[in-house]
């Protein structure tokens, strides 16, 4: 066996980390980066630099390389592809041995894949487009506390999307008035109401008061309707200790579901909370506040499909996923891709939807995608078509903005939803025939009729900033 010797100095990254002959192992974590190199840096060197800086490399040769099996532990840039329609950047595919990462730690995965490498001078911009987590790593993660089927059983709701609403105005209401709004929405026909992402424990409404008034509203609406109801109580807090204190109180008063802002709250806190929810029989709703800071720039950051995968591993029963038709960013095909990534047990590579790798989730439960943001009754046919039954459709302004009040807004949405589901089940192409379906339903629902008149001119027709790259042929 040849004896390794140390040779000091700086050498090109490609000499160690560019390996086009490498065939990825089933146990490797695979990443696709979109790299925009600095002028004068060729593709192979840029790809190798990213592989090095996100795994074992540093800027110079170090003698301690001789104390480990560098060839085993290093990341390997094994393929490069053009980005269709954009010659300023390219895709680089990198394989990482599974032993580089702590088991069950999305924190550790992100620290490597999107850590210091994103400030590396050799690249002008860098975006993590997709990650393949091998089943060997998936099995080390807790995943959703309960998942879609368990939630349906807990809430006793089957055969349709779940219906929700974000209480508005999101800030400024007293706890008592907040609880009143919750009650009216639930009594009117919604399954859930929710805190908005920035409702924590402010001077105008402390968390414990909110929890108490909301629980009173839930219990009253359940008695009157005979249906299970819930409200996503946001337990996001300044410290993990305070977060768990709020979660424990929610459990104590009988709340079925709590909520966490998983990006601003942090992945460590989220994984811990998901584990707590699993142990304590609580459902967990996840808000994605701050995601667009990371995912909206098409050349730099982290694609939302990666944030979706990370959340499924970290744990959550719901995740906001965009609407396609509402006020928030979201290309239709890309959205369909990450919705499947949230719910399905196996997802095939499909470049037309931005999916770069097969992803096997094994027996890990799925996550409810949550459509929320600028939607109203006219969007219902498209939402039911796009998201299917295993989803949560949340109408904030589209409920509380009803001219007759919250209960009427909730009733309008419930009637619209059930009309669309019934028509779909009869074979009607509801996205195409939606106007007819809703108009017919409105004949027996004055609340729906008024809602349709109120929002008939409201559209959000802005071009998508982060478009899918043209599919490879």
Swiss-Prot record:
Pfam families: RuBisCO_large, RuBisCO_large_N. Signal peptide: none annotated. Its EC number is 4.1.1.39. The keyword Manganese does not apply. The active site is at residues 168, 287. Keywords: Calvin cycle, Carbon dioxide fixation, Lyase, Magnesium, Metal-binding, Monooxygenase, Oxidoreductase. The record marks 327 as: Transition state stabilizer. This is Ribulose bisphosphate carboxylase large chain.
């Amino acid at each position: 066996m040849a004896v390794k010797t140390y040779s000091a100095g700086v050498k090109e990254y490609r000499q160690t980390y560019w390996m086009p002959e490498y065939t990825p192992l089933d146990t490797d974590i695979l990443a696709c980066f979109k790299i925009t190199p600095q002028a004068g840096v060729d593709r192979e060197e840029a790809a190798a630099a990213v592989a090095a800086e996100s795994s074992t490399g540093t800027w110079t040769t170090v003698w301690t390389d001789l104390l480990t099996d560098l060839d085993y532990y290093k990341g390997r840039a094994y393929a490069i592809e053009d980005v269709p329609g954009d010659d300023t950047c390219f895709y680089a595919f990198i394989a990482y041995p599974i032993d580089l990462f702590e088991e069950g730690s999305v924190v550790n995965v992100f620290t490597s894949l999107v850590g210091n490498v994103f400030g590396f001078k050799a690249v002008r911009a860098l975006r993590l487009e997709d990650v393949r987590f091998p089943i060997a790593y998936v099995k080390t993660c807790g995943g959703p506390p309960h998942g879609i089927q368990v939630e349906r059983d807990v809430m006793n709701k089957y055969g349709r999307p779940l219906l929700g609403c974000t209480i508005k105005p999101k800030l400024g209401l007293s706890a008592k008035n907040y609880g009143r709004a919750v009650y009216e929405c639930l009594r009117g026909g919604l399954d859930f109401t929710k805190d908005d992402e920035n409702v924590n424990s402010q001077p105008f409404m402390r968390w414990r008061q909110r929890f108490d008034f909301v629980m009173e509203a839930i219990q009253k609406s359940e008695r009157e309707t005979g249906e299970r109801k819930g409200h996503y109580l946001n337990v996001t807090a300044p410290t993990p200790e305070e977060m768990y204190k709020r979660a424990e109180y929610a459990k104590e008063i009988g709340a079925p579901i709590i909520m966490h802002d998983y990006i601003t709250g942090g992945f460590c806190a989220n994984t811990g909370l998901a584990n707590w929810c699993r142990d304590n029989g609580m459902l967990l709703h996840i808000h994605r506040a701050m995601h667009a800071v990371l995912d909206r720039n098409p050349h730099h950051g982290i694609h939302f499909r990666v944030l979706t995968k990370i959340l499924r591993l970290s744990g959550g029963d719901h995740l906001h996923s965009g609407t396609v038709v509402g006020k928030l960013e979201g290309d239709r095909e890309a959205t369909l891709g990450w919705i499947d990534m949230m719910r399905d047990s196996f997802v095939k590579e499909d470049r037309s939807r931005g999916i770069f790798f097969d992803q096997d989730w094994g027996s890990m439960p799925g996550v409810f995608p949550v459509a929320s943001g600028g939607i109203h009754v006219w969007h219902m046919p498209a939402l039911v078509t796009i998201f299917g039954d295993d989803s949560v459709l949340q109408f904030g302004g589209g409920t509380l903005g009803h001219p007759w009040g919250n209960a009427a807004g909730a009733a309008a949405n419930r009637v619209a939803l059930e009309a669309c589901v019934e028509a779909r089940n009869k074979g009607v192409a509801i996205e195409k025939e939606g106007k007819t379906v809703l108009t017919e339903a409105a004949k027996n629902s004055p609340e729906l009729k008024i809602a349709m008149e109120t929002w008939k001119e409201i559209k959000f027709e802005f071009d998508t900033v982060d478009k899918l790259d043209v599919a490879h042929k």
